UniProtKB/Swiss-Prot annotation:
Disulfide bonds: none annotated. It is a multi-pass membrane protein. Keywords: Cell membrane, Membrane, Transmembrane, Transmembrane helix. Its main location: membrane. This is Uncharacterized protein HI_1680. Belongs to the YccS/YhfK family. The chain crosses the membrane at residues 9-29, 60-80, 83-103, 136-156, 391-411, 506-526. InterPro entries: Integral_membrane_YccS, Integral_membrane_YCCS_YHJK, Memb_transporter_dom, YccS_N. It is found in: Cell membrane.
Length: 718
């Protein structure tokens, strides 16, 4: 079905239809007094809506209803018993938060169950004789949303995964745009500063790839694979290859740009990268608009012009063979990117052998329990967040029960939605929540002047609920504004005095926000558990594993198997984790002043290492078709394995042994470069030698960084 609707619009269709049905039911059966739990049940269902194939969605609905039933009924039975209720909510908060250790899907349903417990409390009316009516109405709302979303899925089965692929190519386009800045001849002196921005863009690409991988994993588990899923799988593999090619570095950008700055070649390389970035964005547009992608011939002409310019440059610089090989390798990678972009415009299918997606999936009660208990340490951010949030929930419940605040559990609702695992995210969410609530209260105070009918109120409930979901993922202030209006309208529909709810809503939000800020600032704050050294160790080890897989495949022949892609993904994920850690630290420059500069130096260092390794990875295609000489086999692989060993154990090696190992590696590489080779052999084998040389030059800098870390820790212990 070629219906061209924005993915965000499609994602809000289920809540729009479900709330419309609920509104008609409330009006027809005259059950205004139960409107709020029914609507909140729909919202809770939307909060845990997870993309999956049809059978996976049915399983999600089944487990969601079970989790919501347990949460809602057990809370309903303890409302009115202050001590029991406070203890119950505290325990539920800790358990539901820790379940997040198992994976994103468990985390989403667990958080939804906690929200349902709060919704059950907020909609509790002591005067109602039927004790189970609130949980039943919440579950009816969730079931209604689930049925509607399954029907909508049948009309748009692949749009979520298509949108995730579109976002990946959008991130890839921005990445290539940033890469092109390295070939700006007028900004040679600024190249060093651009590495940080490039690393951040790389982290965005990795995040987008992870979302695509998870979406595809759940789509290709079944026997039948939709043709569009196969197409998205092909796009995903192409994006990965483009990323590896673009991430490859064969030279010092500053040196090569300085040499080329008075030629047209550097301008052509920059323009080619910009056009390739534009092609990625055109792929994004074609996926979002559900149109075929057409390869832009300008990109091909730009490539041919660049190759012609290089031929002229080579004819004038025949003595600079090393430099020519570097540029030729860069152009080979740009040609490969062009090929990937061109073949995406053609109707081909990915082979079954390549169609393997790996994602972490924990199954079995024993494994799930083991994973959860492995986080029972204050070194785990999840455990700190679970304990912190549990204390906050306990405090909020105690305040409400002790002071008997009217509608006081809005304090608790605010803290649960605002309190995030780290300080920076909480601070942003706090500001957005307060702004949205204030605007909502101001606009809500004007509603009584409209003197709306029940039909108009229900229509506004539909509108505000839909807009809440539309803005939920990209503008939390707007979503808070619309949910505040929705709550005030629901109070009016139920027959309560809306004016009496305005100030409690505002004051409770402010109090909840203050408690959340205090919690993340003083209860096991991030700065006390700085993970920079840990993340840097993980990043370096994953780089070593990535290099090991590349060397193995160079030695025994390329096979783009699952293990290689997992190693590559892990290296990029830990690089992204390092980037994210520094980004969070940079948001609090006063607290992390002592760590920031060396952290950014390490980030650039790790990114250089990863780009040098990626260049070898991209070279596997050529090596597969070459006859490796005995001279190359006996020289290259032993020294490569020494480098891998050094990377894996760099923080453990004594200084004297490291210096000896470094000298041995450098000596071997110099001997290899002096070996007699034909011009053809030099053109083929010089790049692997060169990449090992580049990696070797980084080893002393890595060793110096980790040596300082060890010395600092020893001094701290004394």
């Amino acid at each position: 079905m070629n219906i061209r609707l924005n993915a965000k619009v499609i994602s809000t269709i289920p809540v729009f239809i479900a709330v419309n049905i609920a509104a008609v039911g409330i009006w027809f059966f005259d059950i205004s007094s139960q409107s709020m739990p029914l609507i909140l049940g729909i919202i809770a269902g939307g909060l845990v809506d997870l993309d999956n194939r049809l059978t996976g969605r049915l399983k999600n609905v089944f487990f969601t209803l079970i989790a919501f039933s347990i949460s809602s009924f057990i809370v309903q039975l303890h409302i009115g018993k202050p001590i029991q209720y406070i203890v119950l909510m505290t325990v539920l908060t800790f358990i539901f938060t820790m379940i997040g250790a198992v994976g994103q899907r468990y985390s989403t349903i667990a958080f939804g169950s906690l929200v349902v417990a709060l919704y059950t409390t907020l909609t509790y009316i002591p005067e109602v004789n039927v004790w189970f009516i609130n949980p039943v109405m919440i579950l009816c709302g969730t079931l209604l949303y689930s049925v509607v979303t399954l029907i909508v899925y049948l009309f748009f089965p692949n749009r979520p995964v298509q949108e995730s692929v579109a976002k990946a190519f959008c991130a890839l386009g921005e990445y290539l745009d940033t890469k092109s800045c390295f070939f700006d001849p007028d900004e040679v002196a600024e190249i060093e500063k651009k590495h940080l921005n490039f690393a951040m863009k790389n982290a965005n690409v990795v995040t987008a790839f992870n979302i695509v991988r998870t979406a595809l994993f759940y789509r290709i588990r079944g026997q039948h694979r939709h043709p569009l899923t196969q197409r998205m799988l092909r796009y995903y593999f192409a994006a990965q290859d483009i990323h590896e090619r673009a991430n490859s570095t064969h030279f010092d950008y500053q040196q090569i740009t300085e040499k080329l700055k008075n030629t047209d070649l550097i301008f052509r390389i920059q323009r080619l990268l910009e056009l390739q970035a534009q092609s990625c964005k055109e792929i994004t547009a074609s996926l979002r608009e559900n149109k075929p992608y057409h390869f832009n011939k300008r990109v091909e002409r730009a490539l041919l012009g660049t190759l012609h310019s290089f031929d002229l440059y080579r004819a004038q610089h025949l003595n600079d063979q090393d430099e020519l090989i570097d540029i030729q390798t860069l152009l080979d990678n740009l040609q490969s990117i062009n090929w990937q972009l061109r073949q995406l415009a053609q109707d081909t299918t990915v082979t079954e052998q390549l169609a393997q997606i790996h994602t972490e999936q924990i199954t079995g009660l024993k494994n799930i329990s083991a994973v959860i208990f492995s986080h029972f340490t204050f070194e785990s951010p999840l455990f700190r967040h679970a304990v912190r949030l549990s204390i906050v929930v306990f405090l909020c419940c105690a305040i409400v029960e002790f002071f008997q605040f009217n509608l006081g559990y809005w304090i608790l609702l605010t803290t649960v939605f605002v309190c995030q695992p780290n300080y920076s995210a909480t601070k942003v969410r706090l500001r957005q929540r307060i702004i949205g609530t204030i605007l909502g209260v101001v606009v809500g105070s004007l509603l009584p002047y409209l003197n709306p009918t029940l039909e108009l109120k229900l229509g506004l409930v539909v509108l505000t609920s839909t807009l809440f979901f539309f803005f939920r993922s990209n503008n939390y202030s707007f979503s808070t504004f619309f949910i505040t209006l929705q709550v005030l309208l629901s109070f009016d529909v139920m027959g309560f005095d809306t004016a009496a709810a305005l100030m409690p809503r505002l004051l409770d939000t402010l109090l909840g926000a203050a408690i959340s800020w205090f919690a993340v600032s003083y209860l096991w704050p991030d700065w006390k558990y700085l993970q920079l050294d840990k993340v840097s160790h993980q990043a370096l080890r994953s780089d070593a594993v990535y290099l090991l897989h590349i060397i193995s495949q160079l030695q025994f022949g390329k096979s783009d198997d699952l293990k290689y892609r997992i190693a590559r993904r892990n290296a990029h994920q830990y690089a992204a984790a390092l980037s994210t850690t520094l980004s969070n630290m940079n948001n609090e420059p006063v607290k992390y002043k002592a760590y920031l500069q060396k952290g950014f130096d390490l980030l650039k260092l790790n990114y250089s290492l990863l780009s040098y390794i990626s260049a070898l990875g991209a070279y596997r295609d050529r090596m597969k078709n070459l006859q490796q000489t005995a001279q190359f086999l006996s020289g290259f692989y032993p020294v490569a394995k020494k480098i891998i060993y050094t990377l894996e154990h760099i923080e453990e090696i004594p200084e004297a042994i490291f210096n000896q190992q470094q000298e041995s590696i450098e000596t071997h590489l110099k001997e290899l470069e002096k070996q007699e080779m034909t011009a053809e052999e030099r053109a083929v084998f010089s790049l692997p030698y060169q990449q090992l040389n580049l990696i070797t030059q980084l080893l002393p800098q890595f060793y110096g960084y980790f040596k300082k870390e060890i010395n600092c820790q020893s001094a701290g212990a004394l």
